[in-house]
A protein has these predicted regions:
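RNase H-like (RuvC/DEDD) metal-dependent nuclease/polynucleotide-processing core
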Residues: 2-220
């Protein structure tokens, strides 16, 4: 199989919608999708797809994959916030979610976590192959992509430049002149990094945090 001829995608959440980056072996392009169903339709011919969203939830405690990924990130560990326990998905208010989380883990959840719960739930309800759609964390991907780069915040100009330079090794053709309207620049960069990890997973060059199967796995 010639992996250069195959397509790989990366998916990143963008304020209630999704950015999908597709790498076809030479060119990297981006598309906006309004739902998980649309993401699945857009990526159905891709060999592997990296998703920057928790695809497994713990029953109690923390996921091993996140603990290992935090250790890998070092000073950038705060870019990973812990996935809540599955019972929290039943909460209808932030206060209720915090109470449920405290009763099981002893800790509340962050507002940031609360705001991504609808997206987490959307992926839980979706029908996809967990060996094709794999969870990734873009900051882990960028550090695996360029281990010697001291990445600045992705919100800074320096950080954007560093990530673009790293992605340039994946593709010389970054279609930055025709990005979908709406998402901010780091959403596009994160989706591209997710596509990079999807390709790595496909060819067996990836790094795994957590389990070898999809039960608690992040790949980079």
């Amino acid at each position: 199989v010639n992996s250069r001829a195959e397509k790989f995608a990366g998916v990143d959440g963008a304020k209630g919608a999704w950015v999908v980056a597709v790498f076809d072996g030479s060119r990297l392009t981006w598309t906006g999708c309004s739902s998980v169903a649309e993401v699945l339709e857009h990526t159905r011919d891709c060999a592997r797809v990296g998703v920057d969203m928790p695809l497994s939830l713990p029953v109690d405690g923390y996921r091993i994959s996140e603990l290992e990924a935090k250790a890998f990130l070092g000073r950038a560990r705060s870019s990973i916030f812990h996935t809540p326990v599955v019972d929290v998905l039943d909460a209808s208010t932030y206060e209720q979610a915090c109470a449920l989380s405290r009763s099981i883990t002893g800790k509340a959840i962050s507002k940031q976590t609360w705001h991504i719960l609808p997206a987490v739930q959307a992926w839980r309800e979706a029908d996809f192959d967990p060996d094709i759609y794999v969870e990734v964390h873009p900051e882990c991907s960028f550090r695996a992509m360029s281990p010697t780069t001291p990445f600045a915040s992705k919100k800074s100009g320096r950080g954007v430049g560093q990530r673009l330079a790293a992605l340039g090794r994946l593709s010389e053709h970054l279609d930055l002149g025709d990005l979908p309207d709406g998402p901010v620049v780091d959403d596009f960069l994160d989706a591209a990094a997710a596509a990079w990890s999807a390709r790595r997973f496909h060819v067996g060059e990836h790094r795994t945090f957590g389990t070898a199967d999809a039960s608690d796995r992040i790949v980079a």
